[in-house]
Amino acid sequence: MTHQTHAYHMVNPSPWPLTGALSALLMSSGLTMWFHFNSLILLTTGLVTNILTMYQWWRDVIRESTFQGHHTPVVQKGLRYGMVLFIISEVLFFTGFFWAFYHSSLAPTPELGGCWPPTGINPLNPLEVPLLNTSVLLASGVSITWAHHSLMEGNRKQMLQALFITIALGVYFTLLQASEYHEASFTISDGVYGSTFFVATGFHGLHVIIGSTFLIVCFLRQLKFHFTSDHHFGFEAAAWYWHFVDVVWLFLYVSIYWWGS
């Protein structure tokens, strides 16, 4: 084997991109089967495949970064660029949902009764659960920043406390969102209002679940002393993602819950 004379990480062949793509296909097909035929077999298979892929891919990345030292400063720089581009792509993803919402609400068609919210839709009160959700996410933004500063100062105990609080707030937000969906007087099939509301807030809810999973992995890694004050990009990426989720919610709250009601 030739000796490596550069700082770049030559990644070994991995099956996880393939199994990840397969799980995405199974989940999207499974959602269609669930919506139209009330069958959960494909969706469950896709979710299990996705969870197994996440576990094994995270395990490999942790092994390469923490135990094999492949994440040199130049590799970390590349990962930072990658994470920034990923968050930009997510911003554009949500831009499409906001576009659909404003396109429908600023010039309501006669079929909607020429008004917004459409005739027959009883929107959620923005000063009840949505406002509580806003305060929960803003508080989690404060606690994740506290965790980050504690980590940079080498205060392990406070970092774990702050990270645990952030995860708890993320789970609480998800439970509040689920209860709100359960109690809503309209559904995703109630015209353009129902579809834009549930798709935009639902995808944001999915991002909160993904972000919470990301933070739980960081919490478990910190318990095992994986992070140092100057080598913790895994946590930094999770914190960036969480702040992005916070900001998107503020736009959702102001646009869909407050102005849209």
From Swiss-Prot:
- Enzyme Commission identifier(s): 7.1.1.9
Q: Broadest EC class?
A: translocase
Paired cysteines (S-S): none
Classification via SUPFAM superfamilies: Cytochrome c oxidase subunit III-like
Places the protein is found: Mitochondrion inner membrane
- Topology in the membrane? Multi-pass membrane protein
- UniProt GO molecular function: cytochrome-c oxidase activity
Keywords from UniProt, A to Z, are: Membrane, Mitochondrion, Mitochondrion inner membrane, Translocase, Transmembrane, Transmembrane helix
Residues on the membrane's Mitochondrial matrix side span 1-15, 67-72, 153-155, 224-232
The catalytic activity, as recorded, is:
4 Fe(II)-[cytochrome c] + O2 + 8 H(+)(in) = 4 Fe(III)-[cytochrome c] + 2 H2O + 4 H(+)(out)
Q: Which PROSITE patterns match?
A: COX3
What do the Gene Ontology cellular component annotations say?
mitochondrial inner membrane; respiratory chain complex IV
Task: Please list the residue ranges that the record places on the Mitochondrial intermembrane side of the membrane.
Answer: 35-40, 106-128, 184-190, 257-261
Its BP terms in the Gene Ontology are: mitochondrial electron transport, cytochrome c to oxygen; respiratory chain complex IV assembly
CDD domains annotated for this entry?
A: Cyt_c_Oxidase_III
Keyword field contains Signal? no
**Membrane-crossing residues?**
16-34, 41-66, 73-105, 129-152, 156-183, 191-223, 233-256
Q: Which Pfam families does the record cross-reference, listed alphabetically?
A: COX3
Family per record: Belongs to the cytochrome c oxidase subunit 3 family.
The protein's assembly and partners: Component of the cytochrome c oxidase (complex IV, CIV), a multisubunit enzyme composed of 14 subunits. The complex is composed of a catalytic core of 3 subunits MT-CO1, MT-CO2 and MT-CO3, encoded in the mitochondrial DNA, and 11 supernumerary subunits COX4I, COX5A, COX5B, COX6A, COX6B, COX6C, COX7A, COX7B, COX7C, COX8 and NDUFA4, which are encoded in the nuclear genome.
Function of this protein? Component of the cytochrome c oxidase, the last enzyme in the mitochondrial electron transport chain which drives oxidative phosphorylation. The respiratory chain contains 3 multisubunit complexes succinate dehydrogenase (complex II, CII), ubiquinol-cytochrome c oxidoreductase (cytochrome b-c1 complex, complex III, CIII) and cytochrome c oxidase (complex IV, CIV), that cooperate to transfer electrons derived from NADH and succinate to molecular oxygen, creating an electrochemical gradient over the inner membrane that drives transmembrane transport and the ATP synthase.
Name of the protein in its database record: Cytochrome c oxidase subunit 3
- The protein's organism comes out as Hippopotamus amphibius (Hippopotamus)
